[in-house]
Swiss-Prot record:
Gene: smg
Assigned protein family: Belongs to the Smg family.
Any single Pfam family the record assigns to this protein: DUF494
Record's protein name: Protein Smg homolog
Species of the source: Shewanella loihica (strain ATCC BAA-1088 / PV-4)
PANTHER family: PROTEIN SMG (PTHR38692:SF1)
Length: 157
């Protein structure tokens, strides 16, 4: 399923090509690209749920204290290792993510059918969430820079 999400993001969203609105056409396109029907359905459902989170009245998206500290469940810790959780905290500290966006990212991560995510995959999920939530263009650009920046190997400038 994650491969399909990446395919859609890279071929439609990130390349600024108009995304097919018709779900049947999109399903046919993904089938022609070699993806299995069951994975396509899961990926499209994942995207629909992402869109619905913006209008959600879920308490975890509405009621929060800016000074609170996120405690991860056992299932979340299994899916997001220490490096991934640390990266989420880092993004909050540099104001790329706020509490609501962090929770949207965690929600979307937990719905992926991957047993665990590596940091690079988490970065793409974050980028997808930021892209889909209006008003986060600056955070999206910062995240894009974090994904595509190439370290030059120097420790000091």
């Amino acid at each position: 399923m994650f491969d399909i999400l990446m395919y859609l993001f890279e071929n439609y969203v990130h390349s600024e090509v108009e995304l097919l609105v018709d779900e049947d056409e999109l399903t046919q396109e993904l089938t022609r690209a070699g993806f299995h029907q069951s994975a396509i359905i899961k990926a499209l459902s994942w995207l629909e749920h992402l869109a619905s989170l913006q209008e959600s009245d879920q308490p975890y998206l509405c009621n929060h204290d800016q000074h609170s500290f996120r405690i991860y469940t056992q299932a979340e810790m299994e899916k997001l290792d220490v490096e991934c959780r640390g990266f989420l905290l880092f993004l909050e500290q540099i104001k790329v993510l706020n509490v609501e966006l962090r929770e949207m990212v965690i929600d979307r991560v937990m719905e992926l059918d991957e047993p665990a995510l590596i940091l690079e995959d988490l970065k793409w999920v974050i980028l997808m969430v930021l892209f889909n939530v209006p008003g986060n263009e600056s955070a999206y650009e910062q995240m894009e820079d974090l994904i595509f920046e190439q370290p030059d190997g120097r420790l000091h400038s």
